[in-house]
């Protein structure tokens, strides 16, 4: 049975364009919309003159013809289930990815995902995990790394469990965007006594205010997001770290969207959270915690959150999927040089210049806090972010716009962590934007 039908009406092309790319491109965009909105069956009234084309696509006539002799039409349907080669080809059309996740995967990483699964207790898997941990420790510049099976949220939750286990109960959480606000909610769930230093969406933290707060002696730790993706600000972690350490406090960092996109040494922080997805350009599913302090055993905490337990067992406390570890290990090889970081910066700079030429207002930050990971465009009220995002999607251009915190502010975002995005694709995107909104 079919749960979400759609009818295509009046798909019409002027005669002189019917044997050109216009038909193919119009068909592609129509099916982009249908596929992206999860319709499962399509109905049309097809002209009898084009019956051969409809049959080739896969449409099936289900009723006698309707209309007049001069304009006779066939009621037809197309099932969007597996096995239709035309639909499969349309679905494989080139996608331009400006999302902050999921990310593009290299062919080498994709190949690892097709390997046969093998035991997480095997010598092969233990050696693979040790090698992966060593690579992560080098990239983050931390004393030790621990890998857990879960999303980046698990990495942050495990850090919070460590803070509580060390009786570091009183904390200051810094928030200037959606993910800072999320840290506030998470830390409170762990029973930590939290105060918030919150500034406006995308505003910089006043470091003098931070310093004064920490001098009060009311806190055991500080938690901050390094790259606040929701706005595209790179918080000044150098200065924040200096202030925190001047006050002999513990520093925990959510670096989920920074790691792999921005080269940075986390040697002076206590904990740093990231994941296998995002800018490491592997598949999401492995949570990563880098640490420069001793991990303590947690007797009264769910075992799944116990970093000490996982670290002691070489990050194999429970079942770990071998293909996820294989994929991550391979993806990390791209960081033997700085080329990946340079490409992120290069694409960011190129797109930013193009957006400026379209007179689109880009959210501004202090020079030191500009993030090359993502560009945030604050659209004027006359242009709907929802319309722009959905219209780009029909053209197989995927940007960040659906999150409620973006919609509330009429914001769209372009991320540059995807390895396959080219300058030609950026030019194409800018051209589509120009057609949509004008100069």
List the predicted regions and their residue ranges:
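Active-site C-terminal subdomain of aminotransferase-like
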Residues: 104-105, 277-353
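A glycine-/small-polar-enriched, mobile loop at the entrance of the PLP active site in fold-type I
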Residues: 94-135, 139-149, 153
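Active-site phosphate-binding strand-loop segment of PLP-dependent enzymes
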Residues: 205-256, 260
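Conserved C-terminal alpha-helix-loop-beta "cap" of PLP-dependent enzymes
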Residues: 356, 360-424, 428
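Acyl-donor binding region in acyl/amide transferases
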Residues: 1-72
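PLP-dependent aminotransferase-like
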Residues: 165-218
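Conserved beta-loop-alpha segment that forms the PLP phosphate-binding cup at the N-terminus of a helix
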Residues: 142-172, 180-184
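Conserved active-site segment immediately N-terminal to the catalytic lysine
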Residues: 266-277
